[in-house]
């Protein structure tokens, strides 16, 4: 099952996503929670400790990996829409309280550029996941609806 929690800002999307993730984990499901909100707080809401949160590398910080997989770079305006991503959830997520967490990241500064290749990577990760009966993916999305059109 794949669930995207989306909507207006400040309405409790992160709290709801974290609650769903913990409830499914408590039921014995294999849960992957993806924090797609640039104001990433899902890890805190899930009860991850600071040391674990600090050790998570957001997808937006994986510049070399993104360039290798998508061909995106400073000199290239085009990028691959179907990069290899099958290893990313297991390699780059962290586990706490029965929930694996994957973080997209954010734009660090104004004028920092588009995070389109990063969104492509995340979309491919979510689409590529082969789910079994006890697998659940929870996406804590950014406010608004623009990301649904990407």
Regions found by a protein language model. Give the residues of each.
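Residue-level preference for the first positions of well-ordered beta-strands
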Residues: 2, 30, 101, 136-138
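Hydrophobic anchor at the beta1->P-loop junction of P-loop NTPases
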Residues: 5
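Walker A (P-loop) phosphate-binding loop of P-loop NTPases
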Residues: 10
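Conserved lysine of the Walker
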Residues: 13
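Hydrophobic positions on the alpha1 helix immediately C-terminal to the Walker A/P-loop
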Residues: 16
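N-terminal phosphate/diphosphate-binding loop that engages ATP/GTP or pyrophosphate donors
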Residues: 23-97
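Switch I (G2) and immediately adjacent beta-strands of P-loop GTPase domains
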Residues: 85-105, 127-132
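Switch II (G3) loop of P-loop NTPases
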Residues: 103-115, 126-149
